Amino acid sequence: MRLSLKILSFLILFSALNSAVGALSPSDLKIIQEVKDEWETTFYTLPQDQQEPILKTLSMKADTLIQQYPDAAEAYLVAGLIQCSLAANEGGFSALGRVKKARQFVLQAMDKNPLAMDGSGYVILGNLYYRLPGWPISFGDNKVARSYLE
């Protein structure tokens, strides 16, 4: 399961990082982008065993972004991506709480703007539902995954 979550994080990262963040002022965009950039640097340049403390700090920053920009779907998407990365680092059953939190953030983002970050929320949710085990362990469901990815 640890490897699957790492792959999931990579796919989410690939789909979302190259997307433009929109509908925010340039200064707001820069603040959200800085957190996203810190996450990208951590994810790609540090060994996995060194990522967790930084990801936890980024998670707190993402929570602050949500408080500062409660209507910005992009802040929720970044928070969801960070939670996915933390889940990949934790692995096993302890990661399930993180992926549920990630799903919650992404669903909130999609309620605000389903096309934020070029519709990355659909890709994130599709991957979460596809990669995770189904009931009774988690919420994985291939049919739901397909509905988000199509």
For each of these PLM feature ranges, what is it?
Residues 72, 116-118:
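Residue-level recognition of tetratricopeptide repeat
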Residues 6-18:
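Bacterial N-terminal signal peptides
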Residues 47-63, 95-105, 138-143:
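Helix-turn-helix repeat elements of alpha-solenoid scaffolds
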Residues 35-47, 85-94, 117, 128-137:
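Short coil/turn linking the two alpha-helices of tandem helical-hairpin repeats
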Residues 42, 58, 65, 87, ...:
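Alpha-helical solenoid scaffolds that mediate protein-protein interactions
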Residues 21-60:
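N-terminal leader/linker segments that initiate helical-solenoid repeat arrays
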